[in-house]
Amino acid sequence: MAYVSMKQMLETGVHFGHQTRRWNPKMRPYIFGARNGIHIIDLQQTVKLFRIAHDKVVDIVAKGGKVLFIGTKRQAQEAVAAEAGRAGQFFVTNRWMGGTLTNFVTIQKSVDRLKKLESMFADGSINRYQKKEILLLERELAKLEETLGGIKNMDRLPQIAFIIDPHREDIAVKECRKLGIPIIAVTDTNCDPDVIDYIIPGNDDAIRAIKLFVAAFAEACMEGEAMGKDHKGETANAEEAMQKAAAVEAAAEAAPAQ
């Protein structure tokens, strides 16, 4: 288990919340105190709650589930795209398109368009168009890739969402809740924890803090995937052993009595 330690959280500034005047009173249970007008988050709770969320991700991925990483703020975009991609999971780092989850069928039509354009540029069939048309199609492809590139292989809804800053990603939160998709979120002191299933109280603005959590959940995904493969291997071996035993038993029954 690759848990994040309290030392790592302190070093990356996870404990720094927002200004005390910019807070959601519902976050009071997760606040240790205040210093120079800034709320300080109780990292003992963050460590405990992180482990719960981490184990949930491992379990879901081990059972064949997928995670959707969401982080459209500038500080999160690079880390979310890199780490989710490394773990083979889905991600949204540009603007969240309303209906990405709740209007999944319609979004898939745009994804199909993206894949078609990619194919046309890859196999050279795009060259049957005039240069001006090709330029327009290049721009369309770039825009679709920017918006949908991280979910173009998402052929079904994710089993869980991991969100950086649920206050900013409120539309994504609403869509997940409407569809019953559990939410894990790095939740700063200005957020509403009531709409999050697995809250991780922490700084959702500092790049180092964001990278710490995103990388940790990418590792959780890969750990779950490895566990799933091991389980499939064990199941296959058990089934093979049962088949061999059945064959031996059948052969023994078919043999003439001495």
From Swiss-Prot:
Composition bias, Low complexity: 236-258
GO cellular component: cytosolic small ribosomal subunit
Keyword Secreted found: no
Residue segments, region Disordered: 234-258
GO molecular function, a single term: structural constituent of ribosome
Pfam family name, one: Ribosomal_S2
Gene3D superfamilies associated with the record: Glucose-6-phosphate isomerase like protein, domain 1 (3.40.50.10490), Helix hairpin bin (1.10.287.610)
Any GO BP annotation: translation
InterPro entries, A to Z: Ribosomal_uS2, Ribosomal_uS2_bac/mit/plastid, Ribosomal_uS2_CS, Ribosomal_uS2_flav_dom_sf
Keywords (A to Z) from UniProt: Ribonucleoprotein, Ribosomal protein
HAMAP family membership: Ribosomal_uS2_B (MF_00291_B)
Similarity-based family: Belongs to the universal ribosomal protein uS2 family.
NCBIfam families registered for this protein in UniProt: rpsB_bact (TIGR01011)
Name of the featured protein: Small ribosomal subunit protein uS2
Taxonomic lineage: Bacteria, Pseudomonadati, Thermodesulfobacteriota, Desulfovibrionia, Desulfovibrionales
Gene name as annotated: rpsB
